[in-house]
């Protein structure tokens, strides 16, 4: 019987630890989210991040701009935010603007997502940096569930900046045998993976023929079709073949939010 892996217990433990850590600091930590436009999914994610921040004693503030906001106004806003806040997130996706240009407006030492190009460069060169939040989340999740990647075939489907690329690098740094798949490669070969991490946003993409017997499947995909939520895994197809899997809700997502605030705490410590 395929086992469902969840993050409830992990998040509960880590949240309590973070709450205690922040309470012992000699300052009130302030965190800002910049949201441009009215993407419905982005609003949900922003709400969850603000709720988490408030729960652990971090002051949170949303800076919400219209999609057609003037670029110079944005630049001025980032300068003001940088002066007042300890950690900053630019909520993605962003339309109509060069994302790198916006990310460079965030001080690399306040960049909770680890996506500022300077942080990214350091990360891919295996230098000290802020770890991209989703990669950190997947790693934390695997460790909590005692899933070792060392010398295992850990394959990644999807090469996104947020998930696929950073987690692939993180796995290589931790002695996994990594292979990456995307639209250009197709899925042939995924069935050899001991652990398969999927992050494409294509609903029910991965079926029984794409996986190895008794493999572990980590689903970071999220799709909403006719008000129903799907991950990248076709659960009905894989349920007799996989050993363990994560659902699209209650697994990696909550740990990603947690990871942002682990990054924030480490940022504060480095400044002391």
From Swiss-Prot:
A GO molecular function held by the record: methylenetetrahydrofolate dehydrogenase (NADP+) activity
Cystine bridges: none
GO BP terms: L-histidine biosynthetic process; methionine biosynthetic process; purine nucleotide biosynthetic process; tetrahydrofolate interconversion
Binding site for NADP(+): 158-160
Reaction(s) this enzyme catalyzes, per UniProt: (6R)-5,10-methylene-5,6,7,8-tetrahydrofolate + NADP(+) = (6R)-5,10-methenyltetrahydrofolate + NADPH; (6R)-5,10-methenyltetrahydrofolate + H2O = (6R)-10-formyltetrahydrofolate + H(+)
One Pfam family from the record: THF_DHG_CYH
InterPro entries found in the cross-reference section: Aminoacid_DH-like_N_sf (IPR046346), NAD(P)-bd_dom_sf (IPR036291), THF_DH/CycHdrlase (IPR000672), THF_DH/CycHdrlase_cat_dom (IPR020630), THF_DH/CycHdrlase_NAD-bd_dom (IPR020631)
Top-rank taxon, per record: Bacteria
EC number in record: 1.5.1.5, 3.5.4.9
Keywords, ordered alphabetically: Amino-acid biosynthesis, Histidine biosynthesis, Hydrolase, Methionine biosynthesis, Multifunctional enzyme, NADP, One-carbon metabolism, Oxidoreductase, Purine biosynthesis
Pathways per UniProt: One-carbon metabolism; tetrahydrofolate interconversion
A GO CC term attached to the entry: cytosol
Function (record text): Catalyzes the oxidation of 5,10-methylenetetrahydrofolate to 5,10-methenyltetrahydrofolate and then the hydrolysis of 5,10-methenyltetrahydrofolate to 10-formyltetrahydrofolate.
Record-linked PANTHER family: C-1-TETRAHYDROFOLATE SYNTHASE, CYTOPLASMIC, C-1-TETRAHYDROFOLATE SYNTHASE, CYTOPLASMIC-RELATED
Family, similarity comment: Belongs to the tetrahydrofolate dehydrogenase/cyclohydrolase family.
Subunit structure: Homodimer.
Protein name per the record: Bifunctional protein FolD
Organism: Mycoplasmopsis pulmonis (strain UAB CTIP) (Mycoplasma pulmonis)
Organism lineage string: Bacteria, Bacillati, Mycoplasmatota, Mycoplasmoidales, Metamycoplasmataceae
